[in-house]
Amino acid sequence: MIFLNINNLNVSIEGKKILDDFNLTINQGEVHAIMGPNGSGKSTLANVLAGNEDYEVNSGKIIFKDSDLLDLNIEERAQAGIFLAFQYPVEIPGVNITPFLQSAINAKLKNNKKPELDNLSFAKILRKKAEALGINTDMLKRSINTGFSGGEKKRYEILQMSILNPEFTIFDETDSGLDVDALRIVTEGINKFKNEKNSFLIITHYQKLLDYIRPDHVHVMRNGKIVKSGDISLAGEIELSGYQNF
């Protein structure tokens, strides 16, 4: 089943073209990885999929589950099942993690015409998922990402993903700034969440992340478009010789 279909997408920012007739198809349950040098358009793609209005879509289509994604705003995309894990998660002082996540999941449940979770029911779910990810429950009393280490910020994003249960998750260089132990914890969380009903797009510079999360397809991106696609062996080729051959 085709889950996401991007067809001839052209995107610019401040008059500069970033994505150039970009095409990509992701089926339900698949994990795709996009690799490429700085400036190739990887993060632009992630932001456009999530609905960042700083980018201008000049032409093309993005079909997600039979709906035109370009007709939906950021909130509508989130409610439709899209989740973006940022390269640099922002700090939100004064906004506590627990009520924020409860409000987010209840908004999604309400949108899907399902009963909302009361405080006790949500607290039990949150604690269980936090413990499964190795997150100290004291962290749940803090403001979002405020004073967090790089690893804590990434773990919180995985917790958020686990709570919201999105159908399509985009990881924009989620391995950036992580040491080996933090990378292992984060990728274990992703692998626990992965199943045949949800799909992933992993954007990264390095093969190391793909040693932990084995993608079904690997793509090389340069100058705003995919220039080569293959399996995990393509990531190994990049590790050995870089991007000069593409």
Cite the ranges covered by each PLM segment.
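Conserved hydrophobic segment flanking the Walker A/P-loop of ABC-type ATPase nucleotide-binding domains
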Residues: 26-28
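The feature captures the beta-strand-to-loop junction immediately N-terminal to the Walker
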Residues: 35-37
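Conserved beta-strand-loop-alpha-helix hinge in the C-terminal portion
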Residues: 217, 221, 225-246
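ABC ATPase C-loop
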Residues: 161-162
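Walker B catalytic motif
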Residues: 170-174, 181
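Conserved structural motif at the start of ABC-family nucleotide-binding domains
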Residues: 4-6, 19-21
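ABC ATPase NBD Q-loop/coupling interface
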Residues: 61-77, 145
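Q-loop/switch helix immediately C-terminal to the Walker
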Residues: 84-88, 94-110, 122-125
